[in-house]
Structures are given as C-alpha cells and as structure tokens.
Amino acid sequence: LTEVHSQDPSLSSTERRKIAARSVEAINHAIRGIPAEKVRFHTCYGINEGPRVHAAPLPEIVDLILQVNAGAYAFEAANPRHEHEYHVWERVKLPAGKILIPGVITHYSNIVEHPELIAERILRYAKIVGRDNVIAGSDCGFSSQATYNPEVHPKVVWAKFQAMAEGARLASKQLWR
C-alpha cells in the first residue's frame, strides 16, 4: 500500500488510494478462507536507509490498512519519519479483536535502541488501544529483499532484539502491575 506513494510521488492522493484499494482487494482475495486471526499484515515502506520523504503518512492509508482481512497489523513506528504517527490511533478506532504490531526497533539505523525507550514506545500504543491489543515488533526486516543483503550487521540485529525483549519486560511490568 505504501509503495504506490513512494514509487510515483507525482500521483494525486486520489490516484494513489485507488491503486492501493485494488491492492487491498487483491490481498483479501489471496487470503480468502484464512481466518483473520491467523493473518498478520505488514505495511512496508522498503528496507533502505533513504530519506523517506515520499513515504506515505499513516493517516493517509490507515483506513486502507484496516480493510485488509487480518487479525494484526504491523507497521513502521520507530524510525524518525513515522514515530510521531502513533497519534493516528487517537482518532482511528482499532476494530474489536484486532492487534497492532508497531515497530519499536528500527532497521534504519545501526544504533541499538535503549530498552527504556522501547518500553515507552510500547506504552504509547497500549495507552491508546489497550494493553491486550499491542505486540512489540520491528519496523521491518533487516536485510534487503530475499537476497540477504544486510544493511544492519547481524550482531547489531540480535542486540536490537535483545533490547526489544527487555523493553517489553519493562513495559509489561507497568501494564500488568
């Protein structure tokens, strides 16, 4: 859904949404017969460390994302281009029974996020959509496409995941006390 925006930024918002809506139809057709709770949909902006000035803002596409027949929605939320977009969930109601998987670690940087920052990111979402409706995730994968061309060194990736586990423990202590 986001690729339409970044691949041809000259398209109008209406044109981009029309193309993205066809993609949603195709996705739903492809997963027909699979219970929604068994489907996790990832909204991908791409893997590279580019400037992301043409990345689709979440408020412009959130309604389309929620039309995908999935039980959970994963999206970039830790990188500097999208971290502020958690506010969209203050205006958009998460449908009952659905789960958000916001990225709380990013593939855009070799910096290992601090567990306390990760906990804060988890808590932001939990406060808005409820603690039972959030699973911590990564913004995206850590290598380009299926060719294993790492942009973040594997040792750094493991350190990021360790920090995410610790951040989730910290958030859980606050959410379930």
Residues covered by each model-derived region:
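Domain-level signal for soluble alpha/beta catalytic cores
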Residues: 1-177
